[in-house]
Amino acid sequence: MNSGFTHITVLLEEAVEALAVRADGCYLDGTFGRGGHSRLILSQLGPDGRLLGFDKDPQAIATGQALAAEDGRFVIVQRSFAELGSETQERGLAGKVSGILLDLGVSSPQLDDPERGFSFMNDGPLDMRMDPARGISAAEFIATAPAEEIARVFKEYGEERFAKRMANAVVARREVQPFERTADLAEVLKVANPAWEKGKNPATRAFQGLRIHVNNELGDLEAGLEAALDALEVGGRLVVISFHSLEDRIVKLFMRKLAKGEADNMPRNLPIQFKPFEPKIKIHGKAQFASDAETKANPRSRSAVMRVAEKLR
């Protein structure tokens, strides 16, 4: 494991405070990363408390295994949090978890390590997989997908305005030479993007789209939210930190639907009577953002949005 890359945990105190940790509770960290949130949770648990960590990244798993060797209250598994339903079932924890934390997106060590292939800033192999042993790499996707599919990924997941133009440039270039390096792809995307945003690399959105697609991030999020609700006990808390509008929209709509129902979207004078909506969760407060002090110390926290819900039934 390369220890030269550090990670500053975003909304550390705020997220753990939102969990309302009980000393004897059972908690789940769905995105262990480098263990910032997990360590703070463990510091608030008593001898009977338990914490289960999830991560797909082998470097995160190595860090988690070292922590598990130090603290018997902690266990880590190499799975996506989308699979927390089956994991909690297997461990007899379904409906018994006191709180679940999901800190979404890519970590600083993943972005900063060129060998992981996440960043256009540092040249490396074009991979982008959280778990390099599973699924296809970004290079494999770019090499085989039709232009229409590449454009869809750039537009739908990267919110890239010039997705079609950039995808066509990628396909034209791959017919001459395949893409193997991040800098190579970034250069082609840069040339194909006719309208650069001030202060933003023109490959940013396309790279985000690729990463989300390769790791099925939005699909995992939707599955993980549903599984989290089933895993929680009544009164248990769900805390989610997202880093871009696509993630936050999914979290916001999921919580709103379970807290308020869909009655507001129905016509007022329907000839049938609907059963009164019974909320499944209560939303705690408004969306929370990193403080000015935190964003100054850690610029990557600027886009963080935290939402909190409590299971009612």
Curated annotation (Swiss-Prot):
Its EC number is 2.1.1.199. Its main location: cytoplasm. SUPFAM superfamilies: Putative methyltransferase TM0872, insert domain, S-adenosyl-L-methionine-dependent methyltransferases. It is found in: Cytoplasm. GO terms for biological process: rRNA base methylation. It catalyses: cytidine(1402) in 16S rRNA + S-adenosyl-L-methionine = N(4)-methylcytidine(1402) in 16S rRNA + S-adenosyl-L-homocysteine + H(+). One of its GO terms (molecular function) is rRNA (cytosine-N4-)-methyltransferase activity. InterPro entries: RsmH, SAM-dep_MeTrfase_MraW_recog, SAM-dependent_MTases_sf. S-adenosyl-L-methionine binds at G35, G36, H37, D55, F81, D103, Q110. GO terms for cellular component: cytoplasm. Belongs to the methyltransferase superfamily. RsmH family. This is Ribosomal RNA small subunit methyltransferase H. The lineage of its organism: Bacteria, Pseudomonadati, Pseudomonadota, Gammaproteobacteria, Pseudomonadales.
